[in-house]
């Protein structure tokens, strides 16, 4: 296009001169009505004429003989770079004048009128073609039921383009139907022909855009991509299938349909969320996988809701049918610990040979909850990880497919969040194929009440993804669209949406009565001939298959199902681990158990600490200009390293750096994590003079180290946390961390935490080692910048408050193995260092929730020595009192147990009041699972002392409800554990700074009032 503009620029002086001369002639004529565009001074360069020149140039590029010889000569000269003054082949003004008719009013009027007529007709045809390309989908025959227009737009007339009376809008009329027009280069309807009659143009456009396929793509701002789609759908005869392809399609439809029929016969009263009404989805998915495998793809990761899931497991993933049928037997108990999940939520991982390509293909269907679309970012994160570990930077080996329902695709915000990750460098999966099962109803809700946009797929427009709507009762159209979708993704590495417009033969589930709310729709559905019968009749009529062959194929699959059903009756137990969607080969034993129940020391050699500290204090790149304030930070780090101390940021640096040396990939993601919300991290340095020149010193630590990824995320919690969870699913040998900007904001991702992180292992036997960093602390910053809601995480912890555990030699590790997640609140950098390293050195994986500090990041007392981090040291679940009070425990009047930042306020207040020998302060670094053994030791050490739990959070929040019950279990309810902290409240914190300090002063006074609880009932 840029070259065309340069050619047009060379034409500009000639056109301008011609216009001036032409206008002077017109002044002698009788008055007429002329309408000029804003670009009248440049008739060939703007408005309609510029389009004409553009078409002429494109036509000349394709075939120089298709244009007049004068244009051929002109374009040849201009294309060769000939100076404008030397261009040959364009007549001079004098030549033009000599060829004009005599200056009679009739002659002067008819010549330009004839030329204008030719241009106008050409542009009219071009506009008509463009109208079909832009709006043809509005009148496509998409609804199998013939009830609704799929787009729901009542303002779009059904005869938008398709009737003859509409031709006048484009400047054409019925008399032009047999007139032959040259086709523009923006269409492929001509095939090998460059001209067609208007009647044939309309017929071919109707076939391409207004039948069972509706295309939305003209909003894409890329000419190459638009041309690619036009070529795929406009070229005559391009959608033809050979007989072998049709037979394969029919066989797949048989399997899809008969599987649902078999389940309906055997378990008529069971919920299974069948696929009836959209049976074509199974052949559709298989067509995508076949085409992608043909183009070199090795791994497909799928995410989908419950509808049709069992069918996908059986006929796409190829899960053994007997194992699927076992899930319907209520008498079978699971051999695995945990709750398990309903059959239509389960996932699966399978490696097999793709029969269509004879290539190995790996398929993974990710387990998910009933929370619709929640699995979308999880699938994308897992896909990104699998691409990362394979070095698949272009997405040629690993791909994701997401299946959606129409109501959820339009209604759930996480869909939008996930789409907006698609082109971000650290989150892109190089294109996802989205399949929308558009059954035109959401449970009982009419789509006209469920969305404000014409289509459920309109959200995909935000990333310029082409949208292919297709009538699901036309299997061949569906197969072709899916094949094109796979090619699009492979060619452009961008998302694409296939909207399967279908219906739901039953209610929301098999027990539901849909006639209550959709009587007319379901009257039509009851009359609807199933797609298998429709297509089989068509194939038999064509002679592609015989009736006998069709019936034999049905009998063959029915026999397979019956044999599998018989085998399922021999099963004695269920194995949930057979449904694992993300296995870690070699990490566990063959039985899925940890190879040991021990954890090695988490400390590292001092020379390694010093080396990492030196790199963290420097800029590895030459001539890299950093900010002056950052220079001071790096200088401070070097001073700490030389003095063998670390603050929070340096301890984190040493954690990550040591793991990278051991070959462990570290990925830190979240809002503003590169610098850190509190400007403490600075893992990405920015040159102050060269735009976008950055340096990540962490990637310059060691030769052959693992890569370090630190990436600022979009302003999303739900989508991004789901993505990082999926990334952590792919491998146990990576430390994947998500940091909230403030801990308060994590709850917009509550669904991921509740449905996946907290309960994922119990439901799906799926380990995950994701780390959540949640900045937390009451610092007078108001109710939305104070609390990460630790009470919520503790309430979901599964350790029993009333069960006194047996203390074995490996109690600390086995306790971690039995819990659903680990909750810690570190009070010093060394604890943070050790707990992160322990996360990788454990022989299993559990989610780790860390309440990280804000003010402690720069607190002069919140530092650790190399001695606390060097070889042989470990994470301390409990840090006991080690001051004066610990030397004479019998004289200690009160023991204050606490966690996190409040420790430093307590120590300061104790010293101010001179109570160092009378009050002991013990810190719980690990809250859950509760360190029963170490807390018991402390309670026994101070057997006669008063026990207090002190927290800065309000009484109905924080840790008190969790720890109180466990303290009483340890103490056998023989001693009280008093509460010191803020009073109960609805909001997490006050918005008034003065009130904050009054509350702090009050509970600190109570904490060290040794007579406060005397005579009070517990």
Swiss-Prot record:
Compartments where found: Mitochondrion matrix
InterPro entries cross-referenced by the UniProt entry: 2-oxogl_dehyd_N, 2oxoglutarate_DH_E1, DH_E1, KGD_C_sf, ODO-1/KGD_C, THDP-binding, Transketolase-like_Pyr-bd
Cofactor: thiamine diphosphate; Mg(2+)
Keywords: Calcium, Glycolysis, Magnesium, Metal-binding, Mitochondrion, Oxidoreductase, Thiamine pyrophosphate, Transit peptide
Reaction(s) catalysed (UniProt annotation): N(6)-[(R)-lipoyl]-L-lysyl-[protein] + 2-oxoglutarate + H(+) = N(6)-[(R)-S(8)-succinyldihydrolipoyl]-L-lysyl-[protein] + CO2
Superkingdom classification of source: Eukaryota
Protein function: 2-oxoglutarate dehydrogenase (E1-like) component of the 2-oxoglutarate dehydrogenase multienzyme complex (OGDHC) which mediates the decarboxylation of alpha-ketoglutarate in the tricarboxylic acid cycle. The OGDHC complex catalyzes the overall conversion of 2-oxoglutarate to succinyl-CoA and CO(2) while reducing NAD(+) to NADH. The OGDHC complex is mainly active in the mitochondrion. Involved in the inhibition of cell proliferation and in apoptosis.
Subunit structure: The OGDHC complex comprises multiple copies of three catalytic enzyme components, the 2-oxoglutarate dehydrogenase (OGDH/E1), the dihydrolipoamide dehydrogenase (DLST/E2) and the dihydrolipoamide dehydrogenase (DLD/E3). OGDHL/E1-like isoenzyme may replace OGDH in the OGDHC complex in the brain.
Main location: mitochondrion
Pfam families in the cross-refs: 2-oxogl_dehyd_N (PF16078), E1_dh (PF00676), OxoGdeHyase_C (PF16870), Transket_pyr (PF02779)
EC number, as in UniProt: 1.2.4.2
UniProt keyword Signal present: no
Official protein name in the record: 2-oxoglutarate dehydrogenase-like, mitochondrial
GO biological process: 2-oxoglutarate metabolic process; glycolytic process; tricarboxylic acid cycle
Residue numbers binding thiamine diphosphate: 307, 406, 439, 441, 671
Enzyme class: oxidoreductase
UniProt record similarity statement: Belongs to the alpha-ketoglutarate dehydrogenase family.
Residues annotated to bind Mg(2+): 406, 439, 441
Entry GO terms, CC: mitochondrial matrix; mitochondrion; oxoglutarate dehydrogenase complex
Residues the entry annotates as binding Ca(2+): 138, 151, 153
Keyword Glycoprotein listed: no
NCBIfam families found in the cross-reference section: 2oxo_dh_E1, PRK09404.1, PRK12270.1
Gene Ontology molecular function: any one: metal ion binding
